[in-house]
Amino acid sequence: MASDELLERIRSIAQPNYPLIKDKLSSVEQIFVLQLSDDGSYIIRANNAAIGIEAGTHPAPTATLVMSSADLKAILDGQMDATKAFFQGKVQIKGDIFKTMALNSLLKGAR
């Protein structure tokens, strides 16, 4: 999946499901970087007022999630559970692992 397609796929899932998790987020912006080993990086910025998704990286994210684009696509499509992928070593998390639970809920909301 090309970078632009993947970015739009993330947006198409996260933005409609944002109302499901916004109450779990604080007013302090959380910044998650999805670093794909084979296809660039994406930033998800979320707090209890808004969510933004863009290509790029950030110098001090709340957490960075490292995985392949194939594994991210499988997670987005509901073919792979993000928590299981973490414990299988397919997803590495650098930073605040507990804050990534909101991100996992955001992506699961589509299913």
Predicted segments — roles?
Residues M1-R111:
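Feature captures hydrophobic
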